[in-house]
Amino acid sequence: MASDKQKAERAEVAARLAAEDLHDINKSGGADVTMYKVTERTTEHPPEQDRPGVIGSVFRAVQGTYEHARDAVVGKTHEAAESTKEGAQIASEKAVGAKDATVEKAKETADYTAEKVGEYKDYTVDKAKEAKDTTAEKAKETANYTADKAVEAKDKTAEKIGEYKDYAVDKAVEAKDKTAEKAKETANYTADKAKEAKDKTAEKVGEYKDYTVDKAVEARDYTAEKAIEAKDKTAEKTGEYKDYTVEKATEGKDVTVSKLGELKDSAVETAKRAMGFLSGKTEEAKGKAVETKDTAKENMEKAGEVTRQKMEEMRLEGKELKEEAGAKAQEASQKTRESTESGAQKAEETKDSAAVRGNEAKGTIFGALGNVTEAIKSKLTMPSDIVEETRAAREHGGTGRTVVEVKVEDSKPGKVATSLKASDQMTGQTFNDVGRMDDDARKDKGKL
């Protein structure tokens, strides 16, 4: 297929050459030669199976050129005849001459074309053979070149791989050395930092230790000072409460003795009056034994009732005073306990001492109150002989004495002091009120 196409191209080249030769002939003919216009036309080639051979194509091209030339000559003659009637003969003669010249030229062109076609054929064959040889040689060279390039590329690749391998090994060794160096530097840096942190920590620990010791000493001194203050204050309060309680107990004792003396004198006087009345009226009493007995009994009952009322009033007042004194004593005990607990919180070593002192003070207060109670009880208790006579008089009709019964109740510590204080307030004797318990402590604060 490629050879047929090449043949067609060569035929076209030959036709062009023939047309060029004809054009040259027309130019060299001079003024008398009629110019012929050769129109080149591309001929469509039939399908490959209907194509003629190379020679046939050449002859067909020559024949076409001849026909074109003839048509041109005939056309020119016809135009000349129509243009001017005068040059018709000349045009006919010229046309005949041109026709003969054209035929001759066509034959020459055919011979020349055949010769050229032969030359072109040989040239084409030579060129094809040469191209074939060149192609084979080029293919061989290309194969050799490719093989050389492949070998060269292989060698170059191997060389590059070796270079890369060496480069990688060098880089690995360099990285290893650099890593080891960095690790060593890091280890040294870490050791330095650890040592520095250790030194700094030791320094801080020493500072904190000294600071803690100083604070502990300050706290100890402060606690000891506060404990001493609390101890002194507790002792001072305990002494005040003790003195106040003793003073009140003494006052209560005196007042109680005075009151009991008055009651005793009143009872004795009443008894004397009754005895005098009974002795002076013996005769009358004998005559009016029953009346006298009833009167004496009534008088005794009245005296006993008065005495009971007085004692009941004193008992009620004593109960109130007892409650008030108990509240005061409890308040004093609570203050003592609070002071003791405060001293215990500030200084543990002084807790036991403060508690012991508080308990001693408390025991002293309650002991003093107990002694006062016993004294009052002993004063209020009637002698045993009077008790026996009174019992015998009740059983056998009388002993000639007027018996006054005094009911004595056992009271708790502090009741008497409270009762006496309430009695003083009822009778207007408020001049012995000492006022607030902590006034003296406030005035004397800082003297100890």
From Swiss-Prot:
Q: List compositional bias (Polar residues) regions by residue number.
A: 420-432
An annotated GO cellular component: cytosol
Feature: compositional bias, Basic and acidic residues: 282-326, 334-354, 435-448
Provide this UniProt record's keywords sorted from A to Z. Coiled coil
The lineage's top-level taxon is: Eukaryota
Question: Tissue range of expression?
Answer: Expressed in mature seeds.
Q: Which residues form a coiled coil?
A: 297-331
Q: Which PANTHER family match?
A: LATE EMBRYOGENESIS ABUNDANT DOMAIN-CONTAINING PROTEIN / LEA DOMAIN-CONTAINING PROTEIN, LATE EMBRYOGENESIS ABUNDANT PROTEIN ECP63
- Function field: May be involved in the BHLH109-mediated regulation of somatic embryogenesis.
Write down what this protein is called: Late embryogenesis abundant protein ECP63
Organism of origin: Arabidopsis thaliana
Record lineage: Eukaryota, Viridiplantae, Streptophyta, Embryophyta, Tracheophyta
Q: Which gene encodes it?
A: ECP63
